[in-house]
Amino acid sequence: MIKKIIFGIAILLSLSCFANSTTSDGSKKDAAKTNDGTTQKIIDDFSAYAGTIKPEVRKEIQEYRVEIVDINKKKRELYNSLSKEAQNFLAEQQKYKQKLSISKLPTEDDSPNNTANSKDNKDTDTK
């Protein structure tokens, strides 16, 4: 299980390093070398940290991930059971929500609770 986690993190970090290594001044090779070293250090640090996790915690995390996969499968099945019109509406609604989240700037009177609630509402309305 830890190997899967490390492999997944390595892929994500590699992709992000690849995207960041394309610089405008043409020093792609230098940036890639630097990012590879950074990536390897992060992977090594995570491996050391993951080795300190208790087996019962690992099992709990694994069970959690299995449950999340089941929930996501049920969400897809429920979405697919909707009419095309309902699916189209939800897709359009999501586009508008994305436009709002991009254009919305944080204000001084926004509390952390309001932000958390808006994230929860967004998650429940998506596929």
UniProtKB/Swiss-Prot annotation:
List lipidated residues, S-diacylglycerol cysteine.
C17
Keyword Membrane included in the entry's annotation = yes
Q: Keywords of this protein's UniProt record, alphabetized?
A: Cell membrane, Coiled coil, Lipoprotein, Membrane, Palmitate, Signal
Lipidation annotated as N-palmitoyl cysteine: which positions?
A: C17
Compartments (UniProt record): Cell membrane
Q: Which membrane topology term applies here?
A: Lipid-anchor
Q: Which residues form a coiled coil?
A: 56-101
Instruction: List the record's Gene Ontology CC terms alphabetically.
Output: plasma membrane
**Signal peptide positions on this chain:** 1-16
Q: Which domain of life is it from?
A: Bacteria
Residue ranges of region Disordered?
101-127
Identification of the protein by name:
Uncharacterized lipoprotein RF_0128
